[in-house]
Amino acid sequence: KNMITGAAQMDGAILVVSGADGPMPQTKEHILLAKQVGVPNIVVFLNKEDQVDDKELLELVELEVRETLDKYEFPGDEIPVIPGSALLALEALIENPKTQRGENPWVDKIYQLMDKVDSYIPTPQRETDKPFLLAVEDVLSITGRGTVATGRVERGTLKISDTVEFVGLKPTQSAVVTGLEMFKKTLDETLAGDNVGVLLRGVQKKDIERGMVIAKPGTITPHTKFEAQVYVLTK
């Protein structure tokens, strides 16, 4: 459930596979889910490289990963695969948080991974010119500040002091935006593609729940009948 909720918001993903063990059953499940919910691009990190003494074994694991990606209609031959050790990189950064490129081989592997993410996963065109819409993923109550709804901005822009409506599941209500936050940074404005927390005035936590949307007033109407394409996942 959580994998589906998160994956549905992604422009791309990093698939982490143990270089020592190879693809596990949940690896295939995650690739399948990524395909079905529309994650367009994947980059692979072969973890635990430090535990593999035989380079040929690591190459066999990489080949197996590429074949698995092909099976689920990702371009296995093209997808970047970066070996490394998350643990050794983390230990190096804990010992010296200011470690730069070229100063530690394991930290360099993480830089290489992120370089591939930047080059292989394109930044999609964002629909910033359309009316604001955010799908609510979670709702929090912050003492003394108000109610915060978090989620991904599907389209449009939003600024502090804007009025919004929250629609679906319950009667439509409106509220004023008093704050915007993303990755512990406060914002004056949020754009399509951002994962953001929206602080709302004049609304209780019980009034909003996951599955609702926050939208520009008058732009979204709730419906009780619709057509959908559904994937049913079996164990």
UniProtKB/Swiss-Prot annotation:
Cite the EC number.
3.6.5.3
Gene3D superfamilies listed in its UniProt record? P-loop containing nucleotide triphosphate hydrolases, Translation factors
**Domain tr-type G: residue ranges:** 1-125
Q: Name the source organism.
A: Gonium pectorale
What does UniProt list as this organism's lineage?
Eukaryota, Viridiplantae, Chlorophyta, core chlorophytes, Chlorophyceae
> What is the protein's given name?
Elongation factor Tu, chloroplastic
Plastid keyword on record? yes
Query: In which compartments does the protein localize?
Result: Plastid, Chloroplast
The family database entries (SUPFAM superfamilies) matched by this protein are listed as: P-loop containing nucleoside triphosphate hydrolases, Translation proteins
